[in-house]
Every structure is written in structure tokens, then in C-alpha cells.
Amino acid sequence: MKKMKVTQFKSGAHRLKSHKACLKGLGLRRINHSVVVEDTPSTRGMVNRVNYLVKVEEA
């Protein structure tokens, strides 16, 4: 399955609870933290919801 690298570049503090939950679901904890996740519709949805907080690259 395809993978993608997601990097958090903005803080999750003072954001909507649902956006904080998406960051937690992706495994992101702090600024400049990167994780490699599978490219599935559910992870794409989480990334799209917090697209102003993260950068996405192919892994």
C-alpha cells in the first residue's frame, strides 16, 4: 500500500477538539514531528481536515 509522510508545522494548541483529535489519530505530537502513514481514505480525510497544520509528502 502507498505511504505518505505527514509533518506537523503549526501548533495544535487552541484548535477545535476535532482537529486535535485528527492530529492525535495521525500520531502527531509536536511541531516538526513527522510520521509515515498508509495512504487510505480515512487518513486522507484526517489530513484534509488539518491541512493548515501539516505538510504531506510521498514516502
From Swiss-Prot:
Keywords: Ribonucleoprotein, Ribosomal protein. Belongs to the universal ribosomal protein uL30 family. CDD domains: Ribosomal_L30. The keyword Membrane does not apply. Pfam families: Ribosomal_L30. The gene is rpmD. InterPro entries: Ribo_uL30_ferredoxin-like_sf (IPR036919), Ribosomal_uL30_bac-type (IPR005996), Ribosomal_uL30_ferredoxin-like (IPR016082). This is Large ribosomal subunit protein uL30. GO terms for molecular function: structural constituent of ribosome. GO terms for cellular component: cytosolic large ribosomal subunit. Part of the 50S ribosomal subunit.
